Amino acid sequence: MVYTCWFAPGLINTTSSTEAAKHPFYIAVTEINLNTSDKTLEVSCKMFADDLEQIIEKNNHTQLDISADKDKSKFDSYIPAYVKSHLNLSVDGKAIDFSYIGFEKEKESAYCYFQAENISSVKKIDINNSILHDFTSDQINIIHVIVNGKRQSTKLDYPNTTANFSF
């Protein structure tokens, strides 16, 4: 299973790394895709890199730079802990444990990747997504779920965190 969350690029206007990010809006996108050939659920999360950096700094009482190679191993530790505490999935009534694959930064966006093994079919998926709700009450989380080529999507405005999809 791979989880994807993203923040829209090109919408960042910060004056310092310690100042809260200022965007016209705050958005993250999580994409969940059933890969039937590998029997995995792939999850990717895309978000603004500076928002992710700042919430990880706040939660872990440390100063980091998401672009710095020296901090990559720390982010590889903090990102899965953060995402797993804010993104919960249930497939056909069973809670899903997903493994962290890694992250990459591209311009203003951070992409975080996860995967759950041994999932060959999905009839129903229940999602609780509060990613970056602890960063701003302006947060919007968009979720895309793709099963057998059929895509369903929803938008969760703060404080709403739950979405249910049936296939």
Regions found by a protein language model. Give the residues of each.
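Bacterial Sec-dependent N-terminal signal peptides
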Residues: 1-23
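N-terminal soluble domains immediately following signal/targeting peptides that reside
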Residues: 20-167
